[in-house]
Amino acid sequence: MARGQQKIQSQQKNAKKQAGQKKKQGHDQKAAAKAALIYTCTVCRTQMPDPKTFKQHFESKHPKTPLPPELADVQA
């Protein structure tokens, strides 16, 4: 292999560049999406982002179960 050393240097340079790009990017989409899911259904443990969606879910999936008190005044 005539370019063995050059290949290794190129790989190291690329790894350093990729690490810099990842650090510059800051956050990932999965963590942000997971943080947005703050409401959890007490019956099925499904997570929802806002109370309106939570109330719609509860009324459609669990119609026989009484509505939780935090959803009583939410407009769906």
UniProtKB/Swiss-Prot annotation:
Classification via Pfam families: SERF-like_N, zf-met
Gene3D superfamilies recorded: At2g23090-like
Region: Disordered, residue numbers: 1-32, 53-76
Basic and acidic residues bias (residue ranges): 53-62
Top-rank taxon, per record: Eukaryota
Biased amino acid composition, Low complexity: 1-13
Keyword entries, A-Z: Cytoplasm, Metal-binding, Nucleus, Repressor, Translation regulation, Zinc, Zinc-finger
Gene Ontology terms for molecular function: zinc ion binding
GO biological process, one term: negative regulation of stem cell population maintenance
Record's subcellular location: Cytoplasm; Nucleus
Basic residues compositional bias, start-end: 14-25
GO cellular component: cytoplasm; nucleus
Main localization, broad class: cytoplasm
Zinc finger residue extent: C2H2-type: 39-62
Database matches in PANTHER family: GEO09665P1-RELATED, ZINC FINGER PROTEIN 706
Known function: Transcription repressor involved in the exit of embryonic stem cells (ESCs) from self-renewal. Acts by repressing expression of KLF4.
The protein's name in its UniProt record: Zinc finger protein 706
Originating species: Mus musculus (Mouse)
Lineage, broadest ranks: Eukaryota, Metazoa, Chordata, Craniata, Vertebrata
